[in-house]
Swiss-Prot record:
PANTHER family: PROTEIN YAE1 HOMOLOG (PTHR18829:SF0). Keywords: Cytoplasm, Nucleus. The keyword Amino-acid biosynthesis does not apply. InterPro entries: Essential_protein_Yae1_N, Yae1-like. It is found in: Cytoplasm; Nucleus. Coiled coil: none annotated. One of its GO terms (cellular component) is Yae1-Lto1 complex. Belongs to the YAE1 family. The complex LTO1:YAE1 functions as a target specific adapter that recruits apo-RLI1 to the cytosolic iron-sulfur protein assembly (CIA) complex machinery. Forms a complex with LTO1; the complex bridges the interaction between the CIA complex and RLI1. Interacts with RLI1. This is Protein YAE1. The keyword Nucleus applies. Its main location: cytoplasm.
């Protein structure tokens, strides 16, 4: 004779518990959450690695752009009223040396390394140096 109080926690009906809709849904949610956490964690690690690898290159290019723009602005401030070409060159440099153009994917190899000298930096360094020579100002090294 079976006593109804023998198994108050209903542990003998494991099969029914495993098929409970609430538990199935809970298991699915935990599984999805674990999957998403794994994806997010992986992306964060790769993003950080990419940032760590690319930051020195971006910082170097940014510094070079800053030097070019600083020299052109200084020359334009001093000589721009009498030199229309210099004023135009400064405006063109502002357009061409925007961050999205300097760091364009097309300039880098698949590993995001520069193959050679950066074409925009080289172009504008030469232009700035031409104006430096014209106005007897130390050029960009």
């Amino acid at each position: 004779m079976s006593n109804t109080w023998d198994d108050v926690w209903a542990s003998d009906s494991d099969v029914e518990t495993e098929r409970s809709p609430d538990l199935v849904k809970l298991r699915e949610n935990h599984s999805k959450r674990g999957y998403l956490d794994g994806i997010v964690s992986s992306k964060e690690e790769k993003l950080q690695e990419g940032f760590n690898d690319g930051f020195p290159t971006g910082a170097k290019l940014g510094k070079q752009v800053g030097i070019i723009m600083g020299i052109l602005l200084g020359l334009r401030t001093r000589f721009g009223d009498e030199d229309e070409d210099l004023s135009k060159a400064y405006i063109d440099a502002q357009k061409e040396l925007r961050i999205n153009k300097v760091l364009s994917k097309s300039i880098f190899d698949p590993n995001f390394d520069l193959q050679e000298k950066h074409p925009l930096i080289t172009k504008w360094t030469d232009i700035a140096n031409t104006y430096c020579e014209k106005y007897h100002v130390p050029s960009i090294q």
